[in-house]
Amino acid sequence: MSRAILVMGESGSGKTTALRTLDPTTTFIIDADRKGLSWRGWRKSYNSANKNYFQTSSVPKITEVLNRIDKGDLQHIKTVVIDTLNMCMTDDEMNRMREKTFDKWADLAWSIWGILTNIHLYRDDLTVVCMAHSQTDRDENGYMFTRMKTSGRKLDKLVPEA
C-alpha cells in the first residue's frame, strides 16, 4: 500500500518551491497548474526527456500516469507529486460550465475522489503527494477549521485531510 500525503496551504505559501528539495531521479511531478515550477533552473532536472515531468489537469491522464508509474516502465520513481488538485477541479468545472445538469458535479466529485482513494492501491514503495490550496471556514459554533479548497458543495463533503 502506497503512502498518501496532502500538502495544503494558501497560494504563494511555498508549496511548489518546497519540491526543489526532492530527488529528481526518483520524483515525478504532474504539473496540473501548467505554470512550471517556481525555482530557477528547474527545467534541467524536471522535463519530458528525463521522464519525470508532465503537464496536465485531466484526471484520466493523471490516472494513466499514476498507473504507468505503478506498474509500467517508471518503476524507479518513488515519489509522485500532483500540483495542484484544485486546478484539476477548476479546469473540469470550466470545461463543462455550459452543462446544466447535476451530473457534472457528481462526475467532478467522483474523479477527484477516485484519485484520492486509489492512491493507496499503488505499490508499497511509492509516495503520492497531492498539493492543494487551503480554505479556512467557521462553523455555526464559531470554530475555525482549515480544509482543502474545493469546487462545488458536493466536493465540500470530501475530507481528504482527515
What does each model-identified segment do?
Residues M1-V81, M87:
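Conserved P-loop
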Residues T21-L22, W42-S45, M94-M97, G142-T146:
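Short, glycine/charged-enriched secondary-structure capping and boundary segments
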Residues L37-R40, C88-D92, D137-M144:
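Switch/connector loops and helix/strand junctions flanking conserved nucleotide-binding motifs
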Residues V65, I115-N118, K157, E161:
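Alpha-helical scaffold elements adjacent to nucleotide-binding pockets in ATP/GTP-utilizing enzyme cores
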Residues H76-M87, L108-D139:
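Glycine-rich phosphate-binding loop used to anchor ATP phosphates in small-molecule kinases
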Residues K78-F102:
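Oxyanion-hole/transition-state-stabilizing segment in secreted/luminal serine hydrolases
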Residues N95-T117, M144-R153:
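Substrate-gripping "pore-loop 1 plus following alpha2 helix"
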Residues Y122, T127-A162:
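Phosphate-binding/switch region of NTP-binding enzymes
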